[in-house]
Amino acid sequence: MLVPLPVAAPPAPPAVPVLLAEGRLALAFRRGEGRFPSGDPIWWLELRRNGSTVVRWPAASGIASRQAADRRWSPGNAAPLPPGLYRLGRPEAWAGSYWIDLSPRFPTSRSALGIHTCLPGSGCICLPNAADTAAVAGWIRRAGITQLTVLN
């Protein structure tokens, strides 16, 4: 059973002018530096406008010991998400938080991928803090964000 662990307090919300700025919002996911206390590498889920990060949330993807595993063709191996473009599903209430379905827009045998609250990591995007998952779900709904790019 995956049990959420607390992490540092979420970042302060962006200033109102940033939220009202012109430009399309997009979600990107990238490998960061450092590790959670669980040993999972830190990744960043970033809300971007015109290529600049507006806000970001710490996340995990894949379990710590499977970071170098095949990311595209081995379902169930707990590797991080493969790089590429994903279609985002509508956020759904799930296990006291949210599930946001991820559908790869490229050939892969991976399935049942999503964004949800968990830590240690799984083969999904795991946000350790339910408040962060709720914030991401809110942005997706309000801004009509329909895709995510996994950068690395």
What are these regions (language model features)?
Residues 126, 149-150:
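Structural signal for conserved beta-strand scaffold positions within catalytic alpha/beta enzyme cores
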